[in-house]
Amino acid sequence: MINFSNTLIILNNDVPCELLKKKYSELLIPTIGILDFKKKKIYKKYNNIFLYSYQNYSFLLDLNDNILLKIQKYLNKNGILDINLYLNDKSNNNSGTSKKDHSKIEDINKILKRLRKECLYNGYINISAEQTMSENGIVINIKAENPDFNKSDDDNNLVSSDEEIYEKCEDKKKVVNRVCDNCTCGKKEKAMNLEKIKINDNEVEYNTENVVSSCGNCYLGDAFRCGSCPYKGLPAFQPGENVKLNLNNEQN
């Protein structure tokens, strides 16, 4: 059900449209002619704009004075443009009607295709086109919607979810900061960060309070350590735990 309280009627300047103008005026629905619509500025937007024309539709294809684009400016988001063209059939009483009817159908299809393209090129969506037979001609009806490209709350939630997933994936990535065996920059000494305390000739104690492990395997023992691990040779330990080594066992 169309709410005519927020509807504008655009009429071509021909006799049948003048009759429509009187009808809509009686219903207190705002109407305006094609020429006035092109020249005047409208200070309101509408949910529905109806355009009526008899015979003439060339003004819809005029790129220099693009009326479809101007109509879109006065449509609300998701507003509907409803184009109605009445093409009078003057060939009903002529001979060879079958050939002429076939040619006319091809012409109508070309008009429909062209008008749909023009609506699409001007940014309309959900475009539908149909033709119906009337008593003395053919009525072409094209409906098109003015899109609303603003993101909905659901779209924003989806974006947030994707961002969260991406951040979680980034957090799971491990950055392995390995130390070269022949380190000359001092990184190996810094990585060791072990305080060596000699208890006696046979025992040495290591304080692991400030130990830093980039891969997380340094605390697990030699079976899990890489070949260049600075803690290679130490038993498994917990950060902050003092590790005692028996030098006699090492020599053996």
From Swiss-Prot:
Names of the cofactor(s): [2Fe-2S] cluster; [4Fe-4S] cluster
Subcellular location: Cytoplasm; Mitochondrion intermembrane space
Region (Fe-S binding site A): 169-185
Chain intervals for the UniProt region annotation (N-terminal SAM-like domain): 1-153
Region (Fe-S binding site B) location: 215-229
Binding positions for [2Fe-2S] cluster per the UniProt entry: C169, C180, C183, C185
Domain-related comment: The C-terminal domain binds 2 Fe-S clusters but is otherwise mostly in an intrinsically disordered conformation. The N-terminal domain has structural similarity with S-adenosyl-L-methionine-dependent methyltransferases, but does not bind S-adenosyl-L-methionine. It is required for correct assembly of the 2 Fe-S clusters.
Protein name: Anamorsin homolog
Chain residue ranges for the region called Linker: 153-166
Subunit relationships: Monomer.
Motif Cx2C motif 1 per UniProt: ranges: 215-218
Chief localisation class: cytoplasm
Family note: Belongs to the anamorsin family.
GO function terms (MF aspect): 2 iron, 2 sulfur cluster binding; 4 iron, 4 sulfur cluster binding; electron transfer activity; metal ion binding
Residues that coordinate or bind [4Fe-4S] cluster: C215, C218, C226, C229
Record keyword Ubl conjugation present: no
Keywords annotated in UniProt: 2Fe-2S, 4Fe-4S, Cytoplasm, Iron, Iron-sulfur, Metal-binding, Mitochondrion
Entry GO terms, CC: mitochondrial intermembrane space
Motif (Cx2C motif 2): 226-229
